[in-house]
């Protein structure tokens, strides 16, 4: 799926992309590829001379592979963004490309940070001025989202601590406490990455 956004009076305006022709007519500041199809990848190549990285390229942990200028002069950045769900927390890899004053983003899952930024930028005039503002605000929003998730984990651990300090703890209660601690440690592990 492709979400394209134009900047109008300092606000993001979403343009529904249903065909290559519609994408070609837009004047985007941001094009967000959410689990793109092969056809959508081809549109990126044909319209923007942009070869979208494969998911295999996302996981490279070498510092030189996380941020670099490619052969076309585009800035390529690889990052992880937090996805905090009821089932637990995990990182989702995201690739960014800054080219021709457009931010291209590529990820395989919908991320709350992206939704939150889109909502803010639609409703607050002057919120963004260019693709650089957009990229920086995505990182700032991710830091805010991660901090909220971390606060939730610590609140859970505090509640677990209060339960364990009761005078009597049955074996069943102790098992629940240990399971809760393990779940929260998993969340802390993902938040720390």
Annotate each predicted stretch with a short phrase.
Residues 80-193:
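Extended amphipathic alpha-helical scaffolding segments in membrane-proximal extra-membrane regions
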